Amino acid sequence: MHLVIVSGLSGSGKTTALHVLEDVGFNCIDNLPVSLLPALVAQIEIHKDQAQKFAIGIDVRNAWQDLSLFPKMVSTLKEAHLPFHTIYLDSHPSVLIQRFSETRRKHPLSDKSTSLEEAIALEQNLLEPIRDAADQTIDTSHLNLHELRDLVKDRVVGRTEATMAILFESFGFKHGTPVNADLVFDARCLPNPHWKPHLRPQTGLDADVVEFLEEQVTVQEMYADIEHYLTRWLPRYQANNRSYITIAIGCTGGQHRSVYLSERLKKHFDQYYQDVQVRHRDIHKHQKHHNHAPANS
């Protein structure tokens, strides 16, 4: 039996997260009053020997007095020795405002006397006890719908299977550092295929770029150092009950060097861990700017 509590700001993706969990076999209950959590836990405890999975959505539609009780409810769950964890979905206020504008939905706390900005600020304050007690916080500011679905699935499914999910994510520093990264490695000091005209339009997935980078001594030295570091410390993360870890590898544009390193690391650690993923966040962004600026990568 496993219990996941999902909370977060309105517009941050809580409903999407619950739908993902429902798709992978969780029994989902949305907008559960916090005051009813002990009663639900008691029922779950009766059937805790059964292989069931539950996901509960808790949000600002609760009375504010109930939300303040959440830390006490977490203590109750721990005392019952139930396997559970809490996910909190967050997002920057400007992104939330844009999402509400695009969907034309009304914020649950906004009214004639409360602006959208004020409603978001009030919600942040009301949900603070849940955010502080959460095991995982996911910032969805820069995630689209599909990326959020994949991230929730990777992290929750990996945790319920008692494994540590590992994500290698390549990116370009010029596009910003991934907000959910646990470890960040900087590959901008390595020889850059961008300055080879025939390699410029290619990526770290292409054979010519791979061949070029494998011929560079410094590239191989950095790869060996990262591999050694992760080999040494990933078991410690796993022993500390981590359900996931995101390892970001960055170069300037996220097209060549970071892609190559991420792919190679993924291939190596696939041999030792059950759930290893790779994601290339910015690999195609250079195509949009290729004719306008020298987007180094």
From Swiss-Prot:
Q: Which Pfam families does the entry mention? A: PapZ_C, RapZ-like_N
Task: Give the binding site residues for ATP.
Answer: 8-15
InterPro entries tied to this protein: P-loop_NTPase (IPR027417), RapZ-like (IPR005337), RapZ-like_N (IPR053930), RapZ_C (IPR053931)
GO-annotated molecular function: ATP binding; GTP binding
Q: Which domain of life is it from?
A: Bacteria
| Functional description taken from the UniProt entry | Displays ATPase and GTPase activities.
Name the PANTHER family for this protein. Answer: RNASE ADAPTER PROTEIN RAPZ (PTHR30448:SF0)
Q: What is this protein called?
A: Nucleotide-binding protein CJA_2809
Source species: Cellvibrio japonicus (strain Ueda107) (Pseudomonas fluorescens subsp. cellulosa)
